[in-house]
Each structure stands twice: as C-alpha cells, then as structure tokens.
Amino acid sequence: MNKNRPNILLFMSDNQSADFIGCYGNYEVKTPNIDMLAQNGMRYSSAFCTNAMCSPCRASVLTGLMPSAHGIHNWLDDNLESQWPDNWNAIGEFDNFPSKLKEAGYSNALIGKYHLGKAWKSSDAFDHWITFPHGHTKSFYKNKIIDNDKTYEHEGHSVEFFTDKTIEFIDDKKKSESPFFCFVPFNGPYGHWPSIKGKPVNKFAELYNDCKLDTVPREGINKRVIDRFSNRILESGGSLPEQFAGPLLLPNNKDSIRNYFSQASLIDDGIGKIIEKLKVSSMLENTIVIYTSDHGFSLGNHGIWGHGMAAWPSSIHRPSFNIPLIFSGPGITKGVSEALVSQLDLANTILNLADAKKLKGGRVDSKILNLADENSHNRNMLFMEQEESRAIRNERWLYIERFNKEGLNYLGCELYDLEEDYDERNDLSNSASHKNIISSLSIQLSKYYDKFSEPKFNLWAGGSAKSNVSNPSFWKKAWGSKWETTN
C-alpha cells in the first residue's frame, strides 16, 4: 500500500437530512457507527447541498459545478432512458475529481447508486463499477445489478448488497501498492413510496416498533405541496407514479416513517461493518472516511414531505438542503465546525487530501476545507438553486429569489433572519425595513450566477436542462413553445 497517499472512502446516503442522524441531535434514529465516526473526526453542522434532487447534487459533488453550469436541474427520469444517447454520461463533457485521483495513481471504485445517465458501462474514471441500471428505488429488494461486465438480479436488500461488495473490494486491495478511492452511494434511506410504503421488513424493523416519532414535526400539509401535486397531474395528463402521492399521504403513515428510520439504521450498520473490515485489515489508519448525503429530506417541516420539488414554488428551507458531512482519518482534527460548507467544496478538499491536482475552470466553485482547524474556512456565503428558485445563505440571512418574467405569475421571494429565526418561519420579504438587505443579497445572487453558470444551461437566461425538468410548461411559457430540454 502507498503510505504517502491515504485511501479515501466516501459514503453518500440518499435523501437524508442532517436532522435524522444521532450525532446531529436526533435521539430516535439509531446511528451508532456514524456517531462514532463523528466522535473520531470533524463534523460539519452547516453543510448544504446545491440542489435538493438526486442527480444535480451527485453531478455537483463529482464536478464542483453548480446545476446551472453542468446542466442537470432535476433527477434524471428513468422513463426517458430510451431518449438518451447510447452510453450517455450526463457529466461526460466535464472534468471530475475521480479522474484527478486516477491521474495521481488511485484505483477508483463506485459501489452503489449512480443516477447520472446510462450506467451499463463504467465512466467518470471508475475502474471498478457496481451499480443499478436505474436511478430510482422502487424497492430495496430484487434489483437488477451491473457488476463490472456482468448483469444479474440480486434478491436481498440493496444496502446490504453494496456493503458486502465494498468489503470485497477492500479485501482485494489489502496487498495493493496503490491507494484507492471508493465511492459508496447507498440508495437509502430514500423516503419515497413505494420503497418505504408500509412496515419495514429489514433487520432493524423491530427497533422502531414503538418509536413515538417525536422528532417528526406535526404540521398540516403546506398549500404549496398541493399546488405541486396539481401541477404534476396537469403535466402528466392525469397519470402519476405512486411515489408522487407520498408527499400527501406520508404525514398520516407512521409505518412508512418508521420504515425510513429503519433504512437509516441499516446504512449505519453497513458503515460499521466496512469500517471494521478496514480495521482488521490494518488499513483504517491510512484511510480517510467521509460521510454525507446527496441532499436533505423534509419529514413535515413547514408542512412539506419530501425535498425541494415537493412544493411549488420549490422549497429551499433548511431540512431539504442541510446535509450531514463528517470527515475522519489521518491528519483530521476532531471537533464540530459551524463553518458554512457547500457540497461543492468536497471535490477539491478530497483532491487536496490526496495531494492530487485540483479541479480548475471559470465555472468551478470548489474551495478547500481546512480539516486541521474546525473554525477555519473561507466561505462566508453559499448558493443553492432549484430550477425556478435560487438562494443565497450566509451566517445571518437566507434569501430566496424566484424567476420572474412578464407573462408569468409572480412567485415571490423570501427572506429569513437566521439569528432570530433558525427554523425559517418569519418571512421578512415584505418588510420595508429590509428592502436594502434584499437588494444587496439579490445583487450578490445575480453576480454569482453570472460567473458560475453556463449560458446554455442557465434556465433563468433562456438556457436548457439535460433530460427533464419538473415543470416544462413553466419554461415553455417563459421562453416560448420551442424551448426544449436537451441531452
């Protein structure tokens, strides 16, 4: 094994807010292994994703680009795969951090959910490739698997399968002279129907039989959720997959919420097994372990169930965007950091830890986390977007701006004072005394997207999106009937 460069193990969960992990303060969801990882490393309390949908976030993590730069504004819809080019990789035209690791001598593995195009062949500089052909999880069981050059169906739970395959990969690397990067994007806890509909049947089901769900807010459904559902009905012609009913039905389905909790514990269990494998293989002391999620998930906060696009206009409230982020390993200080962190920071931070060349370019907005100092980070604001909604967040303010154009219904903006209103309940956007603050934040927002967006993918400037958007009729109304998505 190369002692000069550490192995890097990146865990990513699917649809998990920091709120639903033990070490972030949740006393109902049992995650002892993630909690131990945090105890032995650096936990970031203010880490945020770029977009609260699967595919855009995964693309941002790998490339260091915002959705308006890489062009993926929504989850890539599996139902449209027949329209995608052969072997289509949605970020294939961009540089990515695994390719920089490979140039530095790393052996790269992806073991888990990909959701960035056609997955039948390995891409993005991964040598070892075990994934699904699909992005959405309809069930955790009986899934088709792509295992390098083989395909087969696996009967058991997919999280346990990816755990076992990661352990096999580590076993295979014990005597290797080159370091490895292993990306393990689990496809849970997920949170959508039909995968979590009803009582759980996994090994942690009984753990939550009597869970009171006191950490789940009890709020009425937000009107914006109903508006989103109505839009989906209109866009689809009246027929919708069952998963889209979840935001309306989850509030009264305790079995599904307990199911979601159990899937989080199953991921935690897998992480514990993988870390134990590193330990008994004498590899842990030279491995940096990272835990994060693609984006958050709202379990009733503000009356929203799901994530960003569960509401219309989209929600950019904290539960959908605040992600867990934990680093543990050699050279990393133990502690808790309140520094503002974007998932865009992951790419160059990992490359820095590996002493590899950084991602560069006019659209790349990756900074480097100082993992030796819990209070040192050079980002004093961060940016988020969800198609028609864009936001700037700093230590004091969250300002959300909506796309506005003549002929469209005005969707409004939102302003929250985070010092006085952590839960983002009191919208100050109509306050006369806050007009100057809104003006200043709006200017900063515009300047950022002028610099870090790619015109052809900037929806607010008439650009397009790859594969699909959530509300195509909205963008056709904005830019004309000839406006289309692209591949």
Predicted feature descriptions by range:
Residues S13, C23-Y27, M42-L65, H73, ...:
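Short, solvent-exposed turn/loop segments enriched in Gly/Ser/Thr/Pro and often Arg
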